[in-house]
Amino acid sequence: MTQLISVNSRSYRLSSAPTIVICVDGCEQEYINQAIQAGQAPFLAELTGFGTVLTGDCVVPSFTNPNNLSIVTGAPPSVHGICGNFFFDQETQEEVLMNDAKYLRAPTILAEMAKAGQLVAVVTAKDKLRNLLGHQLKGICFSAEKADQVNLEEHGVENILARVGMPVPSVYSADLSEFVFAAGLSLLTNERPDFMYLSTTDYVQHKHAPGTPEANAFYAMMDSYFKRYHEQGAIVAITADHGMNAKTDAIGRPNILFLQDLLDAQYGAQRTRVLLPITDPYVVHHGALGSYATVYLRDAVPQRDAIDFLAGIAGVEAVLTRSQACQRFELPEDRIGDLVVLGERLTVLGSAADKHDLSGLTVPLRSHGGVSEQKVPLIFNRKLVGLDSPGRLRNFDIIDLALNHLA
């Protein structure tokens, strides 16, 4: 078996102990702090003693797909090409989901590990990530969302519902993430993969603020699984795809800037196109509203004038040109618009008001996408070695840290 592999200009040592990398979707660090203070996360609380607790930056836009793919490639979107959940395909002139592996431009560490002879397992909450994370992977790969369809030929394992002892959970529930952890425990106990990647859903974080009973119960559930993985001798590495913030005014009303309506009023209809890369099939909990948008200019709308107009709107944190955004956030130039707009911490960006169904927002809006959701945890159940001055850490450094720098 190969002991060292090279993927996207980085080298990884193959682990001799089961290694579990966990992406906790929407894990604003305050959730962990509050759960620990409430006595709901004793294992995480103990990690300051025998493990490592750090902070890193996620990829901007701070959305699910770009960050999960950055984690499993060890590289930013400029390398792997996935810069949102949704993008405007210039060739077809259509807005499309980036769930298809044909949009992926780089190999994953997961697939390369499997090629090197390791048993690799991937369990995701939502099926939207399965094709991307499992691209060219010869191993185990399935989603909790479609656990009833898991079979040996396609997914590398079978009878997962019976093994886990849970029914197929609702996609809008905490149970969807718990199924991921329970499935991971079953795989660790039975197949004992060399490397496992677990990715959850941020349904709870969209609905419940840090320190609420629902949030603390969710983190207590995760904490119990982290402890069991640890007790079975696994290396456990935990990070997030993005943080989460309230996007409301002082009395809980959504703070929304409908950019398409504002641009249409300024320049006329059909002269600009606002695209929201947070858009995906699961919009009940966020209404396709996030703090990052990209804008395409048409019919000779002056770029400088559009920048000044957008930057002058209260709630807009920054407006960047395509080249500025690509340089700052390491994005692929052919998959973003002429401008990138970032909302302030308490503000989300929409397109046109009549394009968003907010009926599912039964609690004050919480969302992500901007730089205010960039800080994420980097947590390990072992001490880091050989990294005296690590400098800026990213969530997509986690596999390198887990395989190359843990005692």
UniProtKB/Swiss-Prot annotation:
Cofactor: Zn(2+)
UniProt keyword annotations, A-Z: Hydrolase, Metal-binding, Zinc
GO molecular function: metal ion binding; phosphonoacetate hydrolase activity
pH dependence (UniProt free text): Optimum pH is approximately 7.8.
Domain of life of the source: Bacteria
Residues that hold Zn(2+) 2 according to the record: 202, 206, 368
Pfam families: Phosphodiest
Protein name in the entry: Phosphonoacetate hydrolase
Taxonomic source organism: Pseudomonas fluorescens
